[in-house]
């Protein structure tokens, strides 16, 4: 089941919210767990057993680590067991096919018969719930959070359906207090509804309209320079609106039931370096990689060479996390290499006068990276790169022009206008001081995004805010249009579901 589907909007969500608010507070976590398992099993019920087994295993490992004591040798052994088992589960389901295919490519070149194995189906969301489980047992080992004895709360944390399929990558230590004591207010619910609609518009109205452009361009067997750059521009916008749209919807759903998740995007395309980009893009993953992988490898505590090695290795593994394909590994290496280069050149200390050039350069680096990220294989990636940097025919091919519509081109222009307007507003409103954190306090500032969702509602405002009222009306109208568009296409999967 996905958020952008009729069955979720018109059946699952209303039924769940009705039962949730009619239930006594002490039963709401259990109801949330049950609903999340139904949400997951809607895809394939046979993988629900694996999901539950991983959850129970890490709950038990957490108890063993907690009983052994913080950072003791016994706790370290339990932690090692937990991490190894988690990675083996992830490795088998996500990377076994890739490993066998890569091995077969090598041995067949020497005339050896290839291995024949049954294709292994990738369980949806496994990358997210395994990473969240690993972060929990590491936090227990480090003493950052106590081991919970409440299996229902822990299982609900791992399974909570707003973030289950494609993040954000949550941490138990950030949400444990909210599982025990969270408040439900009309203000918070209204904020959640606005945020959900905002994400829905991003996904259905913009990202889904851009998808055909990228698909057509990447499918061309002989793209022109114009085709290749159009495809890169379209996918760059599509991926942002698709993934940030999902994150907005997840955050909004969390607010509807009293949770406040961490922000996952902070206008990444205004970044002036790759380093800044990773402070703004997929923040929950980038901070996870920093806290649990980069620091564990040694971070910047060793020699200069070791620091650069740790940066590149972290991004290589981050690329591999996205998918079992050489394209993702190379994409990770691309970002890791530029992170190391920027650290060596002290890019953050560059003069302010060259900021526009830094922004253009950083955006081009990100977009070039998205090409291999989107490509189905290396052949497609090299074909796109060859067309992009041949700087030959800037016109679109006849096949591409025949498939493109005026509405698609208009949506692409609109997407970049939205990125520019809100990016500029964010740039001048406040400097980036670090990754946004999850906030449990009901008085926390409302999150920022394509539309600013005020924590107040019209019913309780002391004075009518005309711009805010106009924004809400626009959001409602666009949401209604997006629902009609969804009803026509019936199903709209998110790009990050494949990871």
UniProtKB/Swiss-Prot annotation:
Its Enzyme Commission number(s) read 2.3.1.-
- Kindly tell me the pathway this chain contributes to: Glycan biosynthesis; alginate biosynthesis
Alphabetized, the UniProt keywords read: Acyltransferase, Alginate biosynthesis, Cell inner membrane, Cell membrane, Membrane, Transferase, Transmembrane, Transmembrane helix
The EC category is transferase
Q: What Gene Ontology terms for biological process does this UniProt record contain?
A: alginic acid biosynthetic process
Provide the coiled-coil residue spans. none
Q: Name one GO molecular function term.
A: acyltransferase activity
- Membrane-topology descriptor: Multi-pass membrane protein
GO terms for CC?
plasma membrane
Q: Which domain of life is it from?
A: Bacteria
Predominant location: membrane
Entries under Pfam families matching the protein: MBOAT (PF03062)
Record's subcellular location: Cell inner membrane
**So where does this one cross the membrane?**
7-25, 40-62, 78-100, 115-137, 150-172, 239-261, 312-334, 354-373, 380-397, 407-429, 475-497
Q: Which family does it belong to?
A: Belongs to the membrane-bound acyltransferase family.
* Functional note: Together with AlgJ and AlgF, forms an inner membrane complex which probably interacts with the alginate polymerization-transport complex and adds acetyl groups at the O-2 and O-3 positions of mannuronate residues. Acetylation of alginate increases cyst resistance to desiccation.
Q: What is this protein called?
A: Probable alginate O-acetylase AlgI
């Amino acid at each position: 089941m996905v958020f952008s589907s009729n069955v979720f909007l018109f059946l699952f969500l209303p039924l769940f919210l009705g039962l949730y608010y009619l239930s006594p507070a002490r039963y709401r976590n259990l109801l949330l767990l049950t609903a999340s398992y139904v949400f997951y099993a809607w895809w394939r019920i046979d993988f629900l057993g694996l999901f539950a087994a991983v959850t129970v295993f890490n709950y038990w490992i957490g108890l063993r680590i907690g009983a052994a004591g913080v950072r003791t040798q016994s706790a370290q052994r339990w932690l090692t067991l937990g991490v190894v088992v988690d990675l083996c589960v992830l490795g088998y389901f996500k990377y076994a096919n890739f490993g066998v295919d890569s091995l077969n490519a090598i041995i067949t070149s020497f005339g050896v018969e290839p291995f024949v194995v049954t294709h292994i189906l990738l369980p949806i969301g496994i990358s997210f719930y395994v990473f969240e489980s690993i972060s929990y047992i590491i936090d227990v080992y480090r003493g950052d959070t106590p081991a919970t004895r409440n299996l229902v709360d822990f299982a609900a944390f791992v399974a909570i359906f707003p973030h289950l399929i494609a993040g954000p990558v949550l941490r138990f230590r950030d949400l444990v207090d909210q599982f025990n004591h969270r408040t439900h207010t009309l203000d918070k619910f209204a904020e959640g509804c606005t945020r959900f609609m905002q994400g829905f518009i991003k996904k259905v109205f913009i990202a889904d309209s851009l998808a055909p452009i990228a698909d057509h361009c990447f499918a061309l067997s002989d793209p022109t320079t114009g085709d290749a750059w159009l495809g890169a521009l379209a996918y760059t916008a599509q991926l942002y609106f698709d993934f940030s749209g999902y994150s907005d919807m997840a955050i909004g759903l969390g607010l509807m039931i009293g949770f406040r998740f961490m922000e996952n995007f902070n206008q990444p395309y205004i970044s002036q370096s790759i380093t800044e980009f990773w402070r703004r893009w997929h923040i929950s993953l980038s901070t996870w990689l920093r806290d649990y992988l980069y620091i564990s490898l040694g971070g910047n505590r060793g020699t200069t060479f070791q620091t650069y090695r740790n940066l590149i290795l972290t991004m290589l593994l981050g690329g591999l996390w996205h998918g079992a394909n050489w394209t993702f590994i190379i994409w990770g290496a691309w970002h890791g290499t530029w992170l190391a280069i920027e650290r060596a050149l002290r890019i953050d200390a560059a003069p302010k006068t060259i900021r526009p050039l830094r922004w253009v350069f950083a955006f081009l680096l990100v977009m070039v990276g998205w090409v291999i990220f989107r490509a189905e294989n290396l052949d497609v990636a090299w074909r796109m790169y060859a067309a992009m940097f041949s700087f030959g025919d800037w016109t679109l091919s006849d096949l591409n022009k025949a498939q493109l519509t005026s509405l698609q081109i208009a949506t692409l222009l609109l997407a970049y206008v939205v990125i520019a307007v809100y990016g500029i507003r964010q740039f001048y409103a406040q400097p980036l001081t670090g990754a946004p954190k999850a906030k449990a306090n009901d008085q926390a500032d409302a999150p920022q995004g394509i539309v600013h969702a005020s924590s107040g509602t019209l019913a309780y405002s002391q004075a009518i805010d005309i711009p805010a009222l106009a924004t809400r009306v626009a959001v409602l109208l666009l949401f209604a249009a997006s629902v009609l568009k969804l009803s026509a296409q019936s199903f709209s999967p998110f790009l990050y579901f494949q990871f």
